[in-house]
Amino acid sequence: MTLERTFVAIKPDGVQRGLIAEILGRFETKGFKLVGLKQLTPSKELAEKHYGVHKDRPFFSGLVDFITSGPVVAMVWEGEGVIASARKLIGATKPLEAEPGTIRGDLAVNIGRNVIHGSDGSDTAVFEINLWFQENELVDWNPSDQAWRVE
């Protein structure tokens, strides 16, 4: 496996419910490296670009309204297989279909308030990281326990 990066965002419901530390902890415990982190209330323009693939869907305006309704914690995580692994940690989009032990399975109830977003593939990850972060906001660093994480 090769090192890759993925974009993850704690949505306004997760921030308002005080779930930031728990969600960060799940990714750190898994062994991934946090290379980008910021809290912001997304602009309508940013939200429309982020959800652009859904622009013709009936729920598009609701997605934009929700993601711009309050602060979001935007993150970039790095690690071997981090994109697929993050998707497994996050769980199914519909919380009622998410397995127990996943973030959505444990912390979310409704699809409209499903706590977290994660990139669904490598192309999406690159697009979302570049949309939400400037290159100088991402930090390359070597954790002191790196030798204990990977071979």
From Swiss-Prot:
| Broad EC category | transferase
What coarse category fits the chief subcellular location reported for this protein? cytoplasm
Respond yes or no to whether keyword Nucleotide-binding is given for this record.
yes
Localization in the cell: Cytoplasm
Q: Which GO terms describe its cellular component?
A: cytoplasm
Q: Kindly list the cofactors needed.
A: Mg(2+)
Enzyme Commission identifier(s): 2.7.4.6
| GO function term, MF aspect, one | ATP binding
Q: Which UniProt keywords apply?
A: ATP-binding, Cytoplasm, Kinase, Magnesium, Metal-binding, Nucleotide metabolism, Nucleotide-binding, Phosphoprotein, Transferase
GO biological process, any: GTP biosynthetic process
Entry-linked InterPro entries: NDK-like_dom, NDK-like_dom_sf, Nucleoside_diP_kinase
Checking Gene3D superfamilies in the record gives: Nucleoside diphosphate kinase-like domain
Q: Which family does it belong to?
A: Belongs to the NDK family.
Subunit details for this protein?
Homotetramer.
Biological role stated in the UniProt entry: Major role in the synthesis of nucleoside triphosphates other than ATP. The ATP gamma phosphate is transferred to the NDP beta phosphate via a ping-pong mechanism, using a phosphorylated active-site intermediate.
The entry's protein name is Nucleoside diphosphate kinase
Q: What is the lineage of its organism?
A: Bacteria, Bacillati, Cyanobacteriota, Cyanophyceae, Synechococcales
Q: Which gene encodes it?
A: ndk
